[in-house]
Amino acid sequence: EPLSNLDAKLRVSMRTEIRRIQQEVGITAIYVTHYQSHAMALSDNIIIMNKGVVAQVGTPQEIYYHPNSEFVADFIGEANFLKGSFVRSTDNGRAVMNIEGGEIEVAPQGELEAGHEYTLVLRPEAATLGEEGGLPCRVVLSCFMGSYQNYHVMVGDTLVKLSENNPKNKRIYAVGEECRLRFDPDAVHVL
């Protein structure tokens, strides 16, 4: 991990320079790292390993948006895991899932079995808070981070983390407030 001892800004700068040189020269490089951001920024393809066994191979986008397991989803970035059971299909090809007593639509990546419980992967940046739609939730953390607002909410007994970008023009929810966790059905990956 050649960049591990550098400060954060220099690490990002050097990572960018390595990628630029790699693309300019057209070389193949193997880069071993535990920093997921380095893997995403420097790779055309990523190999995720778990206990010495290959867990998934793919492009950064494939692995991030379509992980094949909870391990891969959690390893490659922040991920929320919601348990939901399949209720029915809709006319537009979506799946209605029951999560903590609420029903939501998701875009499944394959056939789902009625009544079967699935794990839904939701990335923090793919969710927002609002007054309507989605799932009922309660805010347990609200933290301004500059370019985004960091929230932790409880959906029933499940903690969900989300990051809303550009909070300047959005309503900021306070700890204890009840609201709705909303997301695009295409943003949810069903395992």
Predicted regions and their residues:
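Glycine-centered loop/turn positions within well-structured domains
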Residues: 37, 61, 70, 82, ...
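ABC ATPase nucleotide-binding domains
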Residues: 1-71
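Small-residue-enriched segments and motifs
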Residues: 16, 70, 84, 137-140
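Generic alpha-helical hydrophobic packing signal
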Residues: 19-22, 45, 54, 60, ...
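ABC transporter nucleotide-binding domain
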Residues: 59-94, 115
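Non-catalytic connector elements of ABC transporters
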Residues: 79, 89-191
